[in-house]
Swiss-Prot record:
Composition skew (Basic and acidic residues), residue ranges: 371-389
TM regions (residue ranges): none
PROSITE patterns, per database record: RADICAL_SAM
Cystine pairs: C127-C363
Annotated source species: Streptococcus thermophilus (strain ATCC BAA-250 / LMG 18311)
Gene (name only): rlmN
Protein name: Probable dual-specificity RNA methyltransferase RlmN
Coiled coil: none
Length: 389
């Protein structure tokens, strides 16, 4: 493992709206292609200028407006007055032996987010974050250790992809991000509009052109939003974090189930499948002697029987989190038994390959650990100043 760090201020405790920050400018990545065209026309430019800017951003992937050599200085000044390009600062990069790379980025207001690059047999896949913190309250998850501070803007979500891609552009080996999973910190459907804007931007044929079938959005189960998403006409993949096959167990480990129990959740999932004719993937974290009993596997098979032809189950090895030490990873034997019960019932399932086990592997863990160190450093510095008086 290699780790590169840069100095930065600790994450601020006081919330401040981005638009109220002195000198704040939104990222131009937050505009759709049509919105960029409209903005250019409103500022006295021809439509083709917006097309040129779009190409500079997503095909040449420049990091400043000054690099756009066929754009007039006057128009560049207007762009600089209204936007920034990439709003993220790189704080930490952790590289795993298996090629997984975990990034810690700092937002304009000093808050921290994680992004993960995974090398798969089918190409480079990036897992993006959609919120600072999370309010869903899953009892096994590192992401929820810090409650939601704010939603990310569409530009901040797009910027994660752009910075990861820039790394490979700079290497000059021709590799490109081909797959995106919206499974990082936060609940994507709790930041619905910005996530939808992000999806349409990265899927745009004139931009990054990441195919819809190569994009997956994961939700903890906001049933009304699943139905709404079904009607958007966005042909991306949907994954649902299930993690338990009955209401009692699911409510005990996922607070969201108290608002949207399995009956409501599966009603929404069935609507999604009927409307889109797309397969749904279920994520199931294997927690030792909690949700990994053979009877749990049978319950899961029964629960998904009605939609078996258009559903798939990922069994996920648990990455332990120190703050949730009452949970541990299921043994290989228990996972194998669970898997066998599902297969005997004709369930399409797989035990998901692990990535980055030698770094802060759990989602949100790098961010949480960094914030702890920042706080400890701030306290130590404050204590030192006090003693020096």
């Amino acid at each position: 493992m290699s780790e590169v760090t840069t100095q930065s201020k600790p994450e601020r405790r006081k919330r401040q709206k981005l638009e109220d920050m002195e000198g704040y400018k939104p990222s131009i990545y937050g505009l759709t292609r049509d919105e960029l065209i409209d903005w250019a026309v409103e500022h006295g430019e021809k439509k083709f200028r917006a097309t040129q800017i779009w190409d500079w951003l997503y095909k040449k992937r420049v990091q400043s407006f000054e690099e756009m050599t066929n754009i007039s200085k006057d128009f560049i000044a207007k762009l600089n007055d209204n936007f920034c390009v990439n709003p993220l600062k790189q704080r930490i990069v952790q590289e795993s032996k298996d090629g997984t790379v975990k990034y810690l980025f700092e937002l304009p207001d000093g808050m921290l987010i994680e992004t993960v690059l995974m090398r798969q047999h089918y190409g480079l896949s990036v897992c993006v974050t959609t919120q600072v913190g999370c309010n869903i309250g899953c009892t096994f998850c590192a992401s929820g250790l810090i409650k939601k501070q704010r939603d990310l803007t569409a530009g901040e979500i797009v910027a994660q992809i752009m910075l990861v891609q820039k790394y490979f552009d700079d290497r000059g080996d021709g590799e490109r991000v081909s797959h995106v999973v919206v499974m990082g910190i936060g609940e994507p459907f709790d930041n619905y509009d910005n996530v939808l804007r992000f999806l349409r931007t990265i899927n745009n044929d004139n931009g990054l052109a990441i195919g819809a079938r190569h994009i997956t959005v994961s939700t903890s189960g906001l049933a009304p939003k699943i139905k709404e998403f079904a009607n958007e006409g966005v042909q991306v993949n949907l994954a649902v974090s299930l993690h338990a096959p009955n209401n009692d167990l699911r409510s005990s480990i996922m607070r969201i189930n108290r608002s949207f129990p399995l009956e409501k959740l599966f009603e929404a999932i069935e609507y999604y499948i009927q409307t889109t004719n797309r397969r749904v993937t279920f994520e199931y974290i294997m927690l030792n002697e909690v949700n990994d009993h053979p009877e749990n596997a049978q319950e899961l098979a029964d629960l998904t029987k009605k939609i078996r032809k258009l559903s798939y189950i990922n069994l996920i090895p648990y990455n332990p989190v120190s703050e949730h030490d009452h949970y541990s990873r299921s043994t290989k034997e228990r996972v194998a038994t669970f898997y066998d019960v599902l297969k005997k019932n004709g369930v399409n399932c797989v035990v998901r390959q692990e990535h980055g086990t030698d770094i802060d592997a759990a989602c949100g863990q790098l961010r949480s650990n960094t914030m702890k160190r920042d706080r400890q450093k701030a306290v130590a510095e404050a204590s030192g100043k006090s003693e020096g008086k």
